[in-house]
Amino acid sequence: MKYQNLLSPITINGITLKSRMTHAKSSGGLDGSDQQFEKATRYYTNVAKNGAALVCMIVGTWPDCEGKRSVMSRLNMDDPGIQEGFTKMIDEVHKYDTLCTASLMNVEPQELNISHLDKWDFNFQGDYNPNFKNKPEISAARIEGMIDDFVYQCKELKRIGFDGVTFYMCYRASILANAISPVLNQRTDQWGGN
């Protein structure tokens, strides 16, 4: 076989994956419809059956520390029916020795930024423009609230049956992506980017 290593197991930090193939974040049919879990289960189990060692699922949202929800998903993760749908789907995918991760993103306060920049010398176009404009600095309390939100969500996702999470730090200047940039994160407190 030309690419035999792709289908051979690999152990990373004590976790053995059945292959070296992973499935990128995808909705798999989780669209808010009545039959969404049936469609998504067929999709994800097919990916697992065809060799993926890990699938990354889009999940819904919980209210954040300010009581807001992301508009990126129609799934309310605090709904017991939604949680049960994910648990059953994960159980089916696990039958193929495939791990399941959830893609998490913060409910980004779009009116805020990781730090205020007095001068903006970057010439970004298109989709980047709305999110890269100067915005007031996000408070330290809000950052701590976001961290608490992620901890809570990770615990809940583990309880539901997920094996791990992937943090979505998008190309559109999310606070998470900005936080690790020494250019964009000019804070001088403990959340600084230096």
Locate the predicted segments by residue:
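Flavin-dependent oxidoreductase catalytic cores
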Residues: 1-194
